[in-house]
Design a protein with these regions (language model features):
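Membrane-embedded catalytic cores of phosphoryl/pyrophosphoryl-handling enzymes
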Residues: 16-20, 33-144
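Helix-loop-helix hairpins and the membrane-proximal interhelical loops
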Residues: 1-20, 28-31
């Protein structure tokens, strides 16, 4: 029965596991905050990359590398990874710049502005590490 759901359970567990790893990296950097596990986008390793890479790997093994299911999961992975490295990362850069401008601008002192999130998206290294984790977990899950 677990095999029926393994294509979704294992990638989800991989994403949760990489979120836990991310907390470990945050702790090493002296930036440990348990909220980052659920409300943060970004950091090492990428749980989004791990999830979609694990899913695509498992679908490839289960349905075949030339199947339509694998093609769909691969396109989903590419879109997700491109979004994480490109668009969402740029949002974080903009948030950081806007927060600094508001803090430094004299006129901003008379008005309260919300602090924008700065931890969005991933660096290419974070995506590669997360994706490698996902691929390895997917291979191990299919081999075992």
């Amino acid at each position: 029965m677990l095999q029926d759901y393994s294509l979704i359970i294992i990638p989800i567990l991989t994403a949760v596991g990489t979120q836990v790893l991310k907390l470990g990296f945050d702790h090493i950097k002296g930036n440990l905050d348990l909220k980052h596990m659920w409300d943060s986008y970004g950091g090492m390793p990428s749980s989004h990359g791990a999830f979609v890479a694990c899913l695509a790997t498992m679908v490839g093994y289960a349905a075949g590398w030339t199947s339509a299911a694998f093609a769909v999961s691969l396109v989903f992975a590419i879109i997700t990874i491109r979004d994480a490295v490109g668009f969402r990362r740029e949002i974080g850069v903009h948030g950081k710049i806007l927060n600094r401008l508001v803090k430094e601008h004299p006129a901003a002192q008379s008005h309260t502005y919300p602090v924008l999130a700065e931890r969005w998206g991933h660096t290419p290294t974070e995506i590669v590490v997360g994706s490698i984790i996902g691929i390895l977990v997917g291979i191990i899950a299919q081999v075992l």
